[in-house]
Amino acid sequence: MEFFKKTALAALVMGFSGAALALPNITILATGGTIAGGGDSATKSNYTVGKVGVENLVNAVPQLKDIANVKGEQVVNIGSQDMNDNVWLTLAKKINTDCDKTDGFVITHGTDTMEETAYFLDLTVKCDKPVVMVGAMRPSTSMSADGPFNLYNAVVTAADKASANRGVLVVMNDTVLDGRDVTKTNTTDVATFKSVNYGPLGYIHNGKIDYQRTPARKHTSDTPFDVSKLNELPKVGIVYNYANASDLPAKALVDAGYDGIVSAGVGNGNLYKSVFDTLATAAKTGTAVVRSSRVPTGATTQDAEVDDAKYGFVASGTLNPQKARVLLQLALTQTKDPQQIQQIFNQY
């Protein structure tokens, strides 16, 4: 009888031990940026990006082992000012291919173009596991480096099943933001990332996420964008508008054979006359033209001062110019018809 009691007790203890060890598996895909940067001084802001590899990033946060089984992979190690279509396609394909091998993904990334990568992945990832992007505003050698705790919170988010089916997420400064709406709003502030039109999805406190809302637009598996067979993306450039603007940048993009042009307009996406005329001509000859705005909040609406249908233009809605460029690149893999492109902008 005593033998059976001891056996049962041992089985119970082993069961509890197994449950404690059953942590989620999280894959960290590292791309570089300030979070992987290093400098010569703990108190000065000068540093070099991409000096720290993914293994050192993970080892700098030993608390990660308490919340997940973490595996790191170095995709690239660059400043995000050098982010490009090839890395975007690599990330999307890798996540889609490895979706069944892990419980969630964390992507470490520079903050300069994080919002663009987040939106691209939000449109192209076909995985129902959490995908979380994270970075830092201060290098790893800074006295008050924000990267380690941001990384911890990102893994917390990726390990939480409640983070699934919310699109690609950005976690910075205790805040969870959605990949479509998030933007960088300050050059140096650690609280730089905000969803300026709709607010955050949630907040993180003491390792727990309090979700407030879900993304309103379609994302990930609910989009038609399949990059599995793509090796390059359509060429799309951005033209900036201002008082007495030159039309030379717009003409240069047209002459270079760009497939699409996004106008960073004034006000409600308005254009200086010479730029307007150049883009109207371009639209008639098959170049996709999207009107966005340099104004940080609000929407660029259809048919306000500009008759979009008449000129073959597309209104970007709440997408800023850099995000409108991302969606136009993907839209052009589906169609060149401006009316159909407008429908895509209305949905995603």
Curated annotation (Swiss-Prot):
It catalyses: L-asparagine + H2O = L-aspartate + NH4(+). Residues 1-22 form the signal peptide. It is found in: Periplasm. Induction: By cAMP and anaerobiosis. Changing residue 111 to V: Loss of enzyme activity. Changing residue 111 to S: Reduced enzyme activity. Keywords: Disulfide bond, Hydrolase, Periplasm, Pharmaceutical, Signal. Its EC number is 3.5.1.1. Disulfide bonds join 99-127. GO terms for biological process: asparagine catabolic process; protein homotetramerization. Changing residue 34 to A: Loss of enzyme activity. Residues 24-348 form the Asparaginase/glutaminase domain. The active site is at residue 34. GO terms for molecular function: asparaginase activity; identical protein binding. One of its GO terms (cellular component) is protein-containing complex. It comes from the Bacteria. It holds the Pfam family Asparaginase. Substrate binds at residues 80-81, 111-112. E.coli contains two L-asparaginase isoenzymes: L-asparaginase I, a low-affinity enzyme located in the cytoplasm, and L-asparaginase II, a high-affinity secreted enzyme. PANTHER family: 60 KDA LYSOPHOSPHOLIPASE (PTHR11707:SF28), L-ASPARAGINASE (PTHR11707). Belongs to the asparaginase 1 family. NCBIfam families: asnASE_II (TIGR00520), PRK11096.1 (NF008304). Homotetramer. This is L-asparaginase 2. The gene is ansB.
